């Protein structure tokens, strides 16, 4: 079994993934930004479950907007274990609103959490993984980078950048025996605080000038809910199960990309073609070896 660090484990996909991996017998480090205050309830619940069920699950503070915090969390794992086998990049935040009404600070903050946060954690974890010449970086992306719905502009941009960073990082770390998997969930409307807890554009002076579109924005959650066929649920557990399946696969057999989308938007077909095109171009450049994990 593996030792796995998960970012953003207080709710939703991160929480379900922590529990699912613990049930499977992995040693899980469920990290969250503010375990002493905002996330205290989640900490208490996870610790109680771990005691009751005998899970090897620990809660560790990790604020992905801080390099020092990322490095401290990884050190904590390495001090207690024989090594870190996998990182699940899950931390992220949704913003809803009119693109023009997002200030540069709004957009910078969203990129800082959703995109640069994963890079910080990689910088903390990769020296160890490279020295062992093994490990898995698993990124929880989103189909939204393909479907690009209205009123989610900066969030869409942050997830597209997150995916691109995962891809280009994979070329380099593959030569040190490190695998990459990108799991792309569709809209998750149940079992998470994603939509209810969404942030909003802060420039109200601009936002009011778009007031005629407010009824559409207010339907964003409902609009995503109606995508699913009767009896179909868009629940974080389906994503957690796929993450558990991927991490259990033998070295060298993990899929580079997996789409988990109850809305069946066709993103799996789009990304299959996109990845084939990308890989063909990398081969034309003469860098084919970066597409395979080096033993």
Label every PLM stretch briefly.
Residues 122, 158-161:
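Active-site helix of classical SDR
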Residues 24-42:
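Conserved glycine-rich Rossmann-like NAD(P)H-binding loop of the short-chain dehydrogenase/reductase
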Residues 10-11:
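Conserved glycine-rich cofactor-binding loop
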Residues 53-56, 76-89, 95:
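A glycine-rich helix->loop->beta "capping" turn
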Residues 98-99, 106-108:
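Substrate-binding pocket helix/loop in short-chain dehydrogenase/reductase
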Residues 175-253:
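SDR active-site lid
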Residues 37, 61-72, 104:
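The beta1-alpha1 cofactor-binding region of Rossmann-like NAD(H)/NADP(H)-dependent oxidoreductases
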